[in-house]
UniProtKB/Swiss-Prot annotation:
Single GO cellular component term: iron-sulfur cluster transfer complex
InterPro entries hit by this protein: DnaJ_domain, HscB, HscB_C_sf, HscB_oligo_C, J_dom_sf
Protein name (Swiss-Prot/TrEMBL): Co-chaperone protein HscB homolog
Superkingdom of origin: Bacteria
Gene3D superfamilies the UniProt entry points to: DnaJ domain, HscB, C-terminal domain
PROSITE patterns attached to this UniProt entry: DNAJ_2
Length: 171
């Protein structure tokens, strides 16, 4: 049973987050190990394993990057944990320029405004990549979607770096 089946969801990238959360809570209640406290040792072990499976599946499905990776795995493209280098030199150049721009923000005349504007630009890029991933997965363009997920990971990492800079500027 795949993660989508476990939660009674269609095998697709776009999902209803509130339905996912609701199904998660229902499954947690149904398979909570405490409900099996007086059951046989075997049933207790199965409940613990099922609870772990539910938690793992929820973590995968609630995150758009891991959800896209999981969908790709379901269709024969496993890019999880790969160390493949990005083959798009234009994208890599853009990423280097963005990181340089982020480094320069601390030295700008108004670093907080500069960071806010930069964060908006990167968030827009992130949303554009998500939208493109959804379209590519819907059209079953698995290789293109895999490349797009790789790019999205770069942008997600940049978003994390923005948060670190923000913490340094504020704190």
């Amino acid at each position: 049973m795949n993660h989508f089946e476990l939660f009674g969801l269609p095998l697709q990238f776009q999902l209803d987050g509130s339905l996912l959360s609701s199904q998660f809570r229902d499954l947690q209640r149904q398979f909570h190990p405490d409900k099996f406290a007086i059951a046989s040792e075997r049933d207790r072990l199965l409940a613990v394993q099922k609870a772990a499976q539910i938690n793992d599946a929820y973590q995968v499905l609630k995150n758009p990057i891991s959800r896209a990776e999981y969908l790709l795995v379901q269709h024969g493209e496993d890019i999880r944990g790969e160390q493949q280098t990005m083959q798009d030199p234009m994208f890599l150049m853009e990423q280097m320029e963005l990181r340089e721009e982020l480094e320069d923000i601390a030295d700008s005349s108004d670093p907080e405004d500069a960071l806010f504007a930069f964060e908006g630009k990167v968030s827009k890029m992130y949303k554009q990549q998500l939208s493109a991933i959804q379209q590519e997965l819907e059209s079953e363009a698995w290789l293109e979607a895999a490349d797009r997920v790789r790019k999205l990971k770069f942008i997600a990492k940049l978003k994390n770096e923005i948060e670190l800079v923000e913490d340094r500027l504020i704190g």
